[in-house]
Structure formats: structure tokens, C-alpha cells
């Protein structure tokens, strides 16, 4: 197949083959996390979006969503000269509550601040001249992260509210934030939440290498329809090119972040050789986090082991369990 693709690169004749015949031979489904597919799946299917929101947001039985209306995804500032922002999916329900959904491939502190900014803007936008503050409705921000940012806990769902610092039962209602670290998701950890498990499996198990879909995903009406919308045959050549371009940009971004992170690690290691390995590791980690991905991962641990550090030092520096580090050192 690679030869077949390469043979058609001359005279700019690759497009039809690569994104038509060749693509369909290789792939059956697209990854739902890509910008194109995520918006196609959830941006124009109310019942499907309602199912996702009810499954993933911390809503009580009385707070469940029953009907929504889509809103423009561009958030225009209230004041002249303010900052315009765009979200992936935005809707409101019959109560007037706002629901903002974002699919993010890479974690950064800047993204967290953007989430706060967007939710605050949605909350403030409800205020009308002469209106009552008591009429303002809550804003829910659901953020699906294809990355790990909380290394100090196995929890992958993080819900935030404005609470009293000494009594969490005292809450200022209005802003609700949910962050889900998709790479941490394991179905058995939330087996009692069936729809949450199914939607997270849909987001994490289906990709360009998928050939067969598990029956329990297909048996759910909304998820089954979403799977159909991921079939390669339903996309145009232009859409497939946009899909490829998206993943290319993600790959470039990750490479740049990893390079910055590794550079910080190496600079810290050099200083550490002079002032003590422990202190140097700490500086390297701090600089690496400031310039790059802000986390220690398995690849970094392997590099440190190759440099001759002990399993205990690598475990301390990367925050990975000692058992995992020892397993890496034996491979």
C-alpha cells in the first residue's frame, strides 16, 4: 500500500488516491477526538450531546438535561476591544443553563485559564440592564483532555466549584468545571456509571486502527449513531485532508513541547552534576516543566535510567511509582 501511495505522488496526483481509495483501504473509522470529527458528532445532534452531558457532568437526577438549543461557538466580548474566543460546542437548556464542551489534545496552564475565562464570559453575558442577579443561571464547562496533568492522583475526573475553604458544603453557585483526563480512564474504576463508561470508551477506544466496534457501544442508540458518523466512507476528500492536517499539527506541537522539556531536563542534569544529582534533578524538572509539558512520563524515566540514575531517584523525579520504574529498568 505504501508503494501504491508513493507511486502517485508525481505531478500532484496524490489527493484522489491517498484520500479516497488508499484511505478507505487502510482505515474504517476516524478518531472522534479530532477537531473535525468531534464537532461533527456533537455539534449538530441534540440527543447525542444531551446523553454525553448527562453522563459526564456531576448532575443530580433533578438536574438532568432534557432539551437543548445550540448556541454560536464564538464568544463575543461584552466590551469593545475585548477578546473573542471560540469553543468546540456550546448550548443552553430550557432552564437557561449554559453548557460548554471542549476537546483538548494537550494540557497547559494557559488552557485552564482559557476555560475559566470562557465560562466567566458566558455567565456575565446573561446579565441584562435592569435584570436580577437571582435570575442568572449556572454555566457548566466540560473539558475532555487527551493528556495527563494531575500526576499526584489516579483520579481522572476533576470537578470544580466555588466553595468555602473550610466548609465544602458552602457553595457559591454559578460556575462548574469538569476536567477529564482521557488517558487515565479505565472502565472498571467507574463500572457503576454505565453511560459514562460507554461514552469514555467511545472517545478512547475508537481510532484510525479500529476495525470492529464492541457490541455494547453499538447497542446504545446515540453512541451507535455516533459510530456511524465516524466511518471513513462518510467523509469527503477535503475533510480527510483536514483530518490528516489536524493530527500533523498535534504531532508537531507534541514534538516541540517534548523538545523543550528534554532541553530543560538536560540543562538541569548538567548543573546537577556540579551541585549534586538530587538538586540538579529538581532544577531540571522545574525548568523542564516551565518550558514544556509539565509532567514526567515513562519516556523520561527511561532516559534517566539510561543515564545511570537509580530507580529511587527516577521515581522521585518523575512521580511514577517505584514498581513501574523497576520494571522499566529490567526491560
Locate the predicted segments by residue.
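Conserved single-residue anchors adjacent to enzymatic active/cofactor-binding motifs
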Residues: 3-9, 14-238
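Short, charged alpha-helical interaction segments and adjacent helix-coil junctions
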Residues: 20, 24-26, 99-104, 201-331
Amino acid at each position: 500500500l505504501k508503494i501504491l501511495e508513493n507511486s502517485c505522488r508525481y505531478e500532484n496526483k496524490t489527493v484522489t488516491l491517498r484520500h479516497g481509495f488508499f484511505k478507505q483501504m487502510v482505515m474504517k473509522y476516524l478518531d472522534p477526538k479530532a477537531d473535525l470529527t468531534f464537532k461533527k458528532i456533537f455539534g449538530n445532534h441534540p440527543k447525542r450531546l444531551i446523553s454525553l452531558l448527562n453522563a459526564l457532568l456531576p448532575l443530580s437526577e433533578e438536574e438532568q438535561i432534557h432539551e437543548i438549543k445550540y448556541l454560536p461557538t464564538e464568544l463575543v466580548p461584552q466590551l469593545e476591544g475585548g477578546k473573542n474566543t471560540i469553543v468546540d460546542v456550546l448550548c443552553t437548556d430550557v432552564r437557561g443553563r449554559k453548557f460548554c464542551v471542549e476537546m483538548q489534545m494537550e494540557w497547559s496552564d494557559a488552557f485552564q485559564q482559557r476555560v475559566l475565562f470562557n465560562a466567566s464570559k458566558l455567565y456575565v453575558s446573561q446579565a441584562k440592564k435592569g435584570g436580577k442577579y437571582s435570575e442568572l443561571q449556572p454555566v457548566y464547562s466540560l473539558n475532555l483532555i487527551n493528556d495527563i496533568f494531575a500526576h499526584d492522583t489516579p483520579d481522572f475526573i476533576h470537578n470544580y466549584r466555588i466553595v468555602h475553604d473550610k466548609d465544602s458544603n458552602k457553595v457559591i453557585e454559578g460556575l462548574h468545571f469538569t476536567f477529564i483526563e482521557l488517558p487515565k480512564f479505565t472502565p472498571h474504576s467507574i463500572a457503576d456509571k454505565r453511560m459514562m463508561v460507554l461514552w469514555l470508551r467511545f472517545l478512547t477506544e475508537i481510532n484510525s486502527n479500529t476495525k470492529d466496534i464492541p457490541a455494547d457501544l453499538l447497542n446504545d442508540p446515540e453512541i451507535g449513531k455516533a459510530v456511524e458518523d465516524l466511518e471513513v466512507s462518510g467523509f469527503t476528500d477535503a475533510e480527510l485532508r483536514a483530518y490528516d492536517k489536524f493530527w500533523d499539527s498535534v504531532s508537531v506541537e507534541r514534538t516541540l513541547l517534548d523538545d523543550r522539556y528534554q532541553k530543560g531536563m538536560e540543562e538541569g542534569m548538567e548543573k546537577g552534576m556540579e551541585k549534586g544529582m538530587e538538586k540538579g534533578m529538581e532544577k531540571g524538572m522545574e525548568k523542564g516543566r516551565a518550558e514544556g509539558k509539565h509532567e514526567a512520563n515513562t519516556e523520561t524515566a527511561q532516559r534517566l535510567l539510561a543515564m545511570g540514575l537509580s530507580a529511587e531517584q527516577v521515581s522521585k523525579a518523575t512521580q511514577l511509582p517505584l514498581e513501574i520504574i523497576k520494571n522499566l529498568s529490567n526491560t
